[in-house]
Structure formats: structure tokens, C-alpha cells
Amino acid sequence: FSEKTANGWKIITKLRNKCGSYTVTDTYQGTERGVLVTSVLHRVSGGREVPRFGKCFRLDAAFDAVHYLGRCGESYCDMKDQFPIRAVDCAVADMVEPNLRPQESGNRTDCTVAAVSDGKTRVVFEAVGHPFELGIKPYTDRELLAMKHREDETRTGTYVTVQAFQQGIGTGACGPGVMPEYRYKLDSDYTLQFLVRIEDEPAR
């Protein structure tokens, strides 16, 4: 359900899967620097670990130019030191890995700002308090699950995911899985906070 508050709109979503039951409370507050998004994940019952927590935004495929400040390659909390933090400009296709079988890929850690542009308008995501993790794909996660081969990849938009965290990937294919320090226990609530705003691209 949703309700209007003194500081903006609050939306509460109840989620349930085979592991447990959760609530996500989202608050959207207008500020001079954009809309302040605050999302709180709370475990009601069941599962005590969560693989990731974030918000996904869909934009038209025309938003293909990416800019971000963060780790300059695919990185996760247990695999990131090889990529320094720097400003990156690329296309959406460069944000996913060209695996023979399409799979989850392209996460960027330690991001403080990200933007996607169609050449006229830019949508900016800015970290508040802590850096976020960033994923940008040309299709949804649900669409990705159905893909078996590279030729199955079909662009349906630009999907920007801003995350508080994503668990590590470990080396489960040829060694140990994710180490305990790179898993996220639901012993307490998790909060994700960032700003989002829309800007006109400067005339050229």
C-alpha cells in the first residue's frame, strides 16, 4: 500500500518466496538535488540470508550512454580489488559480459554516481551515505533466465539496478562457495538510500 507523508510518499511492499516472508518500505522525498529514495528491507519470517537488495528502474532502449564513478570492471564484494575506482563512459552492452550462455554478470561495486543518457536527457543516480552497487542490462533478470545462447539476447529496454549489496560469488565451480563474510544475514534491517534526478544534456 502507499500513503502520503509530510516528507513525501511511502510505499510498503510485502514479499514472500519459498525461503521466507519480507517487507520492503520505500519512501520517495523531493529535495533540491532530486528525489531521495529510501528503501528498507525487513525480514518477517523464514530465510535469514538474502543474495542482494536493490531497486530496478526501466528506461527506453534509447538510453544507451552510460557514465559512472566506481570500480572499472565487473566486480563483487569478494572480487573487486583488481579494478580501481575511476570514471567510466561506455554503452549499455559493455555493462554485461559476453558469456556463451547469457547469465547474471556486470555488477559494479563502490559506485558513488551513475547516469544513463539518450543524448538529450540524462537520468542520474547519486549515492547517499554509502557507495552503491550498480547493474545495467539491456533486458530484465526474468528475461535473462530464459536465455540459453548468445543469439537469444534481445534488447527490451535499459534496466538500471541500484543495490545496497550483492553477495559474493565465491568459486563454487572449482572450489569453495561464498565465504561467510561475503554473505548478508537478515539479523537486522538493511537500508538503501540514493538520489535520482533527471537533467537536460548540455547543447552541443
Positions of the model-derived regions?
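Beta-strand/loop-rich accessory regions of lumenal/periplasmic or secreted enzymes
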Residues: 1-204
